[in-house]
Amino acid sequence: MAVIAGLGTYLPKPRQSAADIAGASGLPEAVVRDKLGIHSKPVPGPEDHVSTMAARASRAALADAGLEAQVVDTVVCINEEHKDYPVWTSGIQLAHDIGAKRAYAFDIGQKCGSGVLGLKLAADMLHADPHLDTALVAGGYRNSDLIDYSDPDVRFLYNLGAGAGAAVVRRSGPGHTLLGSSFVTDGSFAGDVLVPVGGSRAPLTPDNVGEYRLQVRDMAGMRERMASRSVPNFLHVLREAVARSGAQVADLRHVAMLHTKRSAHDAILAELGLGPEHSIYLADYGHIGQVDGFLSLQLAAQQGRLRRGDLVVIVAAGIGYVWNAICLRWEGGDAA
């Protein structure tokens, strides 16, 4: 079975604090910290472009695996759509930047669920194609650029930050074994959260350039639908991924969960019969899109929370909407 042989992340140095967000949005700082669950978050510096950050995380993952870039057969690029340039296959640039000269590269997208999708796709490719031995799953994120803090409808997106994550996935050998996964998509949310201009439906013009930001079209309707579907869908993909791994929820030792509001995070753990010791709440990082799962794994390893043989699940969600999860069996030492 395919294994994660190395993990890497990159976080920009600039940070935005709860006080900064409160000042920009008009919310009380206590609401930002306690309800939204944001103490601070990394935001991009002048040179922290999506492809640049992805390359830095990729080099860290390769170093963690003890491998050179030349051994990579394919680059599964999970860069966010908001990247260096529009209409651009950023994975090809990523492969070039890290020196993966043998690899073919491509981009995939499932918004903040792209990390889980990338791991599953890499494992499936290695299983199906005998000519592939090593895949790199990597991508960066900086959708914090697209947030207008004066818009209360995107308050649930005030946690968006910046950074990158990467995983070296190999056909076999030492590493953390990838197990079962589960996905749910619900297209009834497809038109709810988007940038309304800059595409073929509403081309960018001098008059509408100010609308180039993430917006919610029907906040009341979306909130009502989410209330009945989001937590149940999180629980469904978690439980199904665990079951497809031949395990039980009680076997879980770490839930690498995306950053969401504290009440939702706690509700998911409680429904699973797990406690706060089974996860890390990313209050000091915010939501770095598809990177959250990679970051949570690294933090858990660095904090000594993971031991050989532990069952771990990465769980994510992305606007559109998707909920997904993938399990792995932790094998050995701390991630770098």
Report each predicted region and the residues it spans.
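Conserved beta-strand-centric core segments of catalytic alpha/beta enzyme folds
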Residues: 1-20, 116-189, 297-336
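N-terminal glycine-rich anion-binding loop in soluble enzyme alpha/beta folds
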Residues: 2-47, 53
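Acidic-glycine-rich active-site phosphate/pyrophosphate-binding loop
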Residues: 25-34, 85-99, 137-146, 206-210, ...
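Glycine/charged-rich beta-loop-alpha catalytic/anionic-binding loops adjacent to active sites
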Residues: 38-40, 74-76, 96-109, 146-151, ...
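Claisen-condensing/thiolase-fold acyl-transfer catalytic domains that form or cleave C-C bonds
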Residues: 51, 55, 82-83, 87, ...
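Hydrophobic pocket-lining "lid/loop/helix" segments that shape and contact the acyl-thioester
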Residues: 55, 59-62, 153-282, 334-335
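Short acidic capping loops at alpha-helix termini that bridge into adjacent secondary structure
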Residues: 68-74, 102-104, 133-134, 248-253, ...
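Short beta-strand-loop/turn "lid" adjacent to the catalytic site in phosphate-handling enzymes
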Residues: 71, 75-85
